[in-house]
């Protein structure tokens, strides 16, 4: 049985093209994926992300629990509302999921995890929470709308109450605050400014309509994917999964090695991988010739020593902002500044870059 979010009627009203996204009927676009992409880069767009899973954790030992569960360290969160991004790993060091954790009280944290991984995530979290006496509460009664773009905050301000505007004033990136009925966070998946707004389901359609009335354009999953790829943000299931180490997924920055006695799940495996130095890495690829880089395409190059090497594209697409094709690729660590990709039986040269292409409207390549 396919699931729908509470905003489903709003999508149909706007003429959205709906697709099955991991068991959810979601809008892929509202007419033009390209226009929706540019809308976010130049103005403001909004996404229904109510399919994401919100999990609240409470208990006296919740901090110690999360220090065990996550590769990043929640001890870094010293101010209420601050958030961090982390991988949740298997004992072998593979990525079960990537998620955001909000520090909302001494005994209260909130996680936002991916929808496609909901069941395994909840089972894993609940299993390990038992040892710490932590209560795990999924919040399916909450919807979520991401408002993203250079003008997103200004347009959202017209919809917020005076109390809500006061609560978010001057809020830095990666913070969240409960303001009235809304939980408003300065997070996103586009590389632009904006908010992710958690709202009770019964108020979600009214909030969506108010944002629409104030010039925020609805955007589908198609634009969400090209925006996150331009920003160099990983997509779980494509750029990493349980077979992939965070060291091979441009997630090394999310591993808190200190304090050295914090025994998080997967630590021993990661330490061995790090010592061996043999993990591949995730890089960016840019192709200015015609054609589109796609997930699964092999990437080949010759090392300085003349040895042939091969990697694979994990995510690829035409970049609407740059006007040519870009990709993320997992490749051996000794890759140089150029590589080759086979497109229509022809080897095409691609430039190897850092895995981020556009952030805050600025081209990085």
Curated annotation (Swiss-Prot):
Any Gene Ontology biological process: glycine decarboxylation via glycine cleavage system
Gene Ontology CC: cytosol; glycine cleavage complex
Disulfide cross-links: none
The EC number(s) this enzyme carries: 2.1.2.10
Family recorded in the similarity comment: Belongs to the GcvT family.
Reactions catalysed: N(6)-[(R)-S(8)-aminomethyldihydrolipoyl]-L-lysyl-[protein] + (6S)-5,6,7,8-tetrahydrofolate = N(6)-[(R)-dihydrolipoyl]-L-lysyl-[protein] + (6R)-5,10-methylene-5,6,7,8-tetrahydrofolate + NH4(+)
Function: The glycine cleavage system catalyzes the degradation of glycine.
Enzyme class: transferase
Record carries keyword Repeat: no
Protein known as: Aminomethyltransferase
Source taxon at top rank: Bacteria
Keyword Transferase: yes
GO terms assigned for molecular function: aminomethyltransferase activity; transaminase activity
Keywords, comma-separated and alphabetical: Aminotransferase, Transferase
Record Pfam families: GCV_T, GCV_T_C
Species assigned in the record: Aeromonas hydrophila subsp. hydrophila (strain ATCC 7966 / DSM 30187 / BCRC 13018 / CCUG 14551 / JCM 1027 / KCTC 2358 / NCIMB 9240 / NCTC 8049)
InterPro entries per the UniProt record, alphabetical: GCS_T, GCS_T_bac, GCST_C, GCV_T_N, GcvT/YgfZ/DmdA, GcvT/YgfZ_C, TrmE/GcvT_dom1
Subunit structure: The glycine cleavage system is composed of four proteins: P, T, L and H.
